[in-house]
Each structure stands twice: as C-alpha cells, then as structure tokens.
Amino acid sequence: MTPEIRIKLEKIRGLLDRLGLDAVLLRKHANFAWATAGARNYISIASEIGAASILITRDRQYVLCNNIEAPRLTSEEKLEELGYAIHTFPWYQDREAALARELAGTGAIGCDLPFADFRAVGGEISPLRWSLTPWEIERYRELGFMTARAIEDAARSVRPGDKECAVVGKLASCLWENGLDYITIFSAAD
C-alpha cells in the first residue's frame, strides 16, 4: 500500500466514524480512481459507474467485480499490490450489493450513488477529494505535460485543407496513444 492510498483510506474511515457507517461502497469512476491513486474501473467513459467498485470497511478494503474484469484489474491496475483484496462474482449475476453485504456484515453501508438499501453519501465523499495530495499534484503536472505534447504533435501534423473532424481525430489518436481520456475535443478552421 502506498502512503497516498493510506492517507485516503484514513479519510474514508474518518467519514465512516462521522456518519456512523461500517462500510462505504465507491462505484463512481472519480471516487474509484481517487481511492486507488488513478486506477480505472471503467470500460466506457460514457457512464458514471464503473465495472468494479471498492468496498471500504473499518479495517479492510476490497474491490468487487465480475469474474471477467478481475484479471484486468489485477494485471493492469495492480490493485492487489495496492492493498485491495479482489472479490468476484459470476459475470451473469447481479451480486454486487449482496457481496458488499457479505463482506461488510450487518452494519450500515454507505454508497457514493443511490444503490440497493445503502445510504447515499456521495455528497459527503466528494469533499474528501477536494484537497490534492502531493502525489496527485505531481500526476496533474505530468498529465498537463503529456496533454501539451499530444496537442503539439497533433498540431504539427495538421495540413491546409484538413477537415475539422480529421484534426480532432489526430488529437484523439495522440491522446489515446498515451492513455489519456478526454471528454470533448473541438476544432475550428476558416
């Protein structure tokens, strides 16, 4: 477990104390990425909910996912190395809530989105992410550098007569080559 993740788990467990919860389930992309120092729980950025979630109890932390996602989360995201125990369920079963309940016991469970009979605590979780850690600041600097480099590479490849959609495609390609997700890219030409 990294010092960054340790600090974040302390924040979450402090929230458990303040809210009288025994566990919290993080399903949103942003919260999953925050709690894992950048791991991706999603297949598509078109949804706010990922293919895996994190359950944090007072003394353990788990990743809950279907059996298809588990190998990727282990090999690519290295979540077990970060201190998360991966618990799976068959891909064809909707067992996320039941598995969370099994792992957390009979106590109160919060969730960052309305889900099952868990208490919705998304509004209380978001402020935990507002102050950046030194590691996050460094990652943002690196992301800024990588984004600038992608924009420069794409801009250098633009030729007179290129369609706006072709320019967007070039930039998208440069971003994706570096594993950078984007929400929107615009291009304008005269």
Question: Where are the predicted features?
Answer:
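A composition/biophysics-driven feature that prefers long, compositionally simple stretches
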Residues: 1-152, 164-165
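Internal metal/ion-chelating core segments
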Residues: 133-190
